[in-house]
């Protein structure tokens, strides 16, 4: 019997918040059993298939990102879909903390996370926090795409 099945939104949010609660940095070991062996994950940086590749990605993220914080702003679950609106706060050596705002869409199959798509504006959110770069970047984006 596999006890690692998500039953409701509160259970998922509790597991997700624990990732970023450790003083040593992000830890994924407690939530990985809730992911499907055939997990499909995609974000602005990468596309991953399978639990081995996903586990390797979480290990890389944990090694690189010791100073991560996460705030959940809103969430909902309808059927087998979970949506989470979040803010990830990253600390850099030379620059002030940066916030990346995003949304995750999680699809469950038999209580396991089968599909996760994270949507965020990686470059815009980071560049907004680099003083000498932010104004020029935003001016360029507005002129070309606004």
What are the functions of these language-model segments?
Residues 4-8, 50, 137:
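Residue-level preference for long, well-ordered alpha-helices that form the structural scaffold
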Residues 1-33, 143-146:
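Short, low-complexity N-terminal intrinsically disordered segments enriched in polar/charged residues
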Residues 63-69, 76-146:
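A beta-strand edge to alpha-helix "cap/lid" segment located at domain peripheries
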Residues 27-80:
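A solvent-exposed, acidic/Ser-Thr-rich amphipathic alpha-helical stretch
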Residues 16, 35, 58, 86-88:
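Hydrophobic alpha-helical core bundles mediating ligand binding, dimerization, or RNAP-core interactions
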């Amino acid at each position: 019997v596999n006890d690692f099945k998500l039953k409701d939104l509160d259970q998922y949010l509790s597991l997700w918040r624990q990732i970023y609660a450790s003083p040593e940095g992000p830890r994924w070991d407690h939530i990985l059993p809730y992911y499907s062996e055939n997990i499909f994950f995609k974000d602005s940086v990468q596309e991953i298939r399978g639990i081995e590749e996903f586990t390797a990605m979480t290990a890389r993220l944990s090694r690189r990102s010791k100073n991560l914080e996460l705030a959940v702003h809103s969430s909902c679950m309808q059927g087998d879909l979970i949506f989470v609106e979040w803010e990830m706060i990253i600390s850099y050596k030379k620059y002030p903390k940066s916030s990346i705002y995003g949304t995750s869409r999680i699809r469950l199959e038999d209580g396991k996370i089968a599909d996760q798509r994270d949507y965020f504006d990686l470059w815009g959110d980071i560049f907004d926090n680099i003083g000498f770069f932010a104004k020029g970047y935003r001016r360029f984006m507005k002129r070309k795409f606004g």
